[in-house]
Amino acid sequence: MHLRADAGAPPAGTPGSLSLVHAPTLMQSRLAFAGRSSLQSPNAVDDCFSALRRIATRVDRDRAHLTIEGDPMAASHATAGSRSNRAVLLTVTCLGQFMVLLDNTIVGAALPDMQHRLHTQLTGLQWIVDAYVLLVAMLLLSGGVFADRFGRKRVYLTGVAVFTAASLLCSLAPSLGWLVAGRVLQGIGAAALSPASLALLAAAHPMPQERIKAIGLWAGLSGIGLAAGPVAGGVLTQAFGWPAIFLVNLPIGVVLLLVGLRHLGESRNPSAPAIDIPGTVLSVVTVGVLTYGLIEGGARGWTSPVILGSFAATVILLAAFVAVEARRSAPMLPLRLFGQRLFTVSNTAMVVVGFALMGSSFFFSQFFVYVQGSSVLHAGLQTLPVSLAMVIVSPYAGRLAARYGFRIVVTTGLALAGLGLLALGMVHADTGYGNVWWRLGLAGIGFALAMSPLTGAAIQAVSPQEGGLASGISSTTRQIGAVLGVAVLGAIVRTRQSGGASFEAGLNSAFLAAGAITLATALFTGLWLARSKPAEGTAAPRRSTDPGAVTTSNGASVNSH
């Protein structure tokens, strides 16, 4: 007997509905509930919880609609039955997201060992990272739709199975090609697992206050994966070699499958829109072709017909994507949202955040190993200031934005991140760690200050019905920036090396470029956020029939399409 997700609840996309924010920070999940409080209001957080209390009252009135599969008269037992499994469900969803986030950072520590054992160049390392991030970025929006249409438990466990099997393939990969293929499959699994885990958690907590607590725990506990990645990667690689960083996922995945099959209840949204297959395919191919040109350009030469052809194909594919999305009734990416200046500015800045953060992080361990001569384990520990700063500062970013406004906090964060990266561009082989760690920490603080307020700005730029969609797009744009960051900064390093410069000089150029772009974005964002206003009110949203309505993509849980 499983709890069905068709009880009365706040409409998806309203201030009380859950918005998918992929970044694993507590305040980002809180900001997703912020609704449409004033852009500069110091009372934004208070307004958020006041709105949730009002919605909770409405939910209480609708609890009579709660049904259980196979026993429509057992409404009175629904809440008690679900509570008995909530601890298990929270553990299962947190562990799944932990795996996804761990793989975002654990690979970086192992890159030097991969390069040595697989006899690959910088280009190969770029593909190892970008193959995973690319698929997560481009399939994340559609993953939530799959979960709503085909069942959240089914999609979650399928994602776990694919991710676990792909991890085994990665650990056994005899060559670079097999490893990249495994990373592609990992990305597909992660894109299904992540939004489905959040949807499962929301469906089990129909009361808004309960959702906030559950999602806060989900975000906080799973976010430990970010901080644990560099250390775990260094320890495992030093002791057993790079395959061990993927083998660590196997016991977690097996446990999740066994427990999930037994204890998770199924839920879905029957009114979810059709999956935008043409848009999804075109988005993956477009970004993939562009990434190919950027990564391989340094090796083949920027004037190579293949590279020039890839850039030309990118333009054609992008035009096709825009044309397809403009004509669909339920597009993966509603282009009309970019008519809001605030939405466009916040997502543009989020691309730069992903670009600079992931692009620079790709080289941190390589700098400590190849330039300063550290061991793989030591290098993993030396990169900790970035992730620790982000984990510590992120919970306060939303509060600062509520008090001082998005413009001040975002501009300050981007400026600090840019200055930190510029400072990293001036370190050398003989620079002591005492003069390096603060540069890493400064960049981490800056990125943490910028990310969740940028998501909040994107949410407030649109109507309440589309708040979840806005947060999902914000997460996707950051991931796209991450793909491009690894590709572009890697191209800078390789181009400098092909011109006779040392690897150290190439790294300095890459860090300086990332810092300059981030500082320029701080100026651009500060100017344009000051002139932007949230979207005006629209018609009241329609009531969803799904109490677990989680807007994870193109309004999968919104009935307004």
Predicted regions located by residue number:
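12-transmembrane solute porter fold
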Residues: 83-102, 107-109, 118, 122, ...
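Membrane-helix boundary and inter-helical linker elements of multi-pass secondary transporters
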Residues: 148-149, 172-174, 237-240, 295, ...
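Extreme N-terminal basic, low-complexity initiation segments
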Residues: 1-15
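Transmembrane-helix bundle of Major Facilitator Superfamily
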Residues: 73-262, 394-397, 404, 408-429, ...
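Short hydrophobic alpha-helical segments enriched in small aliphatic residues
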Residues: 3, 7, 23, 34, ...
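Intrinsic disorder in cytosolic terminal tails and internal cytosolic loops
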Residues: 48-85, 528-561
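Hydrophobic transmembrane-helix bundles of small-molecule transporters
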Residues: 58-63, 67-68, 216, 238-351, ...
